[in-house]
Amino acid sequence: MTRSFVLSVLLIALAVPVSAQTQPNPPASAQPTPAQPEYPIIRVGVLSYLQYAAETENRDGANSFDVTRAYLNINAQVARRVRFRFTPDIRRITDGSLAGSLTLRVKYAFGQLDTLGHPGSWARFGLHQTPWLDFEESINRYRVQGQMFAEREGLIPGSGDFGASYFTPLPDGYGEVHGGVFNGEGFTQQEANKYKSVQARLTVRPFPNRGIAHGLRVSGFFNKGWYAADRPRDLGIVMGSFEHPNLVVTLQHLNATETPSATAPVEIDRNGWSLFAEPRQGPSGWAGLLRYDSFESDEALPDSARQRVIAGGGYWFVWPRAKVGLVATNEHVDYDQPTQLDENRVLLQMHFEF
């Protein structure tokens, strides 16, 4: 009996592990399905330029504090590939009963469809950025100091216009293309007639995978427009640019052919070039600023040229979602025309972006 009992105990002891090993493993817990974003996703930001300007030559010592830009950027992702932007801006009225007042106006209001072709491509419809100025301002961060060269000389009527455009990167990082059709009057004016402006920019990055040479780009821009029938409004720009954490340089040349006057329809040829350089500690920290513009407003007229020199520097604070710049410059404008008084001004400015 004792033997039978011991044998039974041994059989039970051996059977328990075997039984445990043959138990099926519990089913793995299913991974939760990622939650879909709840559209629309709305982000609100601000871009503002504040300044103090003091005239020091031929302007009777005029000086003033001012707000030269105040954007409220409202960006909405309506669906996975659908976006909308609305940006009101503040401008100073210079005529009428409200002359001198700051008033609100619409700067941008457009819809955008993403990834129409190559990844990173998009199409826009409405009041949005034209191909050149927004691109140049992405390289030269000193829009707070003043307008870019072509806009300052009146060849591009503002950075935004009513129209439709398409943007696409080139394969393997070799550049990008942006082109569209616009009213041609800029965002401050309504369409004057049936004629439109066709604008296109091609930017080539010849060495996308070559270290420091990655920062080199060559860009070309062309605007084919009309004031009216037989009154062209053409502009061509070629620019080389180099971007590095410690140095940004651009050199551009432009030519324009225009017939602005309806009463005296004479074709005017204009040309000029501009150099911009910013040696800096990096995106954050101290930076120097040098810009030289030379522009001839009418090649057929003597003494129609003017030169602008901007020199100074700034200090930049850059965070993941915000940027503050403190900028001080001296701007001198020299006119070849003897009857045109030269200009010189000191500018103290602040750039706020968040």
What is each model feature region?
Residues 1-31:
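Cleavable N-terminal export/targeting peptides
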Residues 4, 22-24, 32, 44, ...:
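Positively charged, low-complexity intrinsically disordered regions
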Residues 20-22, 30, 35, 50, ...:
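Intrinsically disordered, low-complexity regions enriched in polar/acidic and amide residues
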Residues 23-25, 33, 38, 168, ...:
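Compositionally biased, intrinsically disordered low-complexity segments enriched
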Residues 30-187, 192-199, 203-212, 276-289, ...:
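Outer membrane beta-barrel
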Residues 49, 56-60, 79, 85, ...:
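Outer-membrane beta-barrel pore domains
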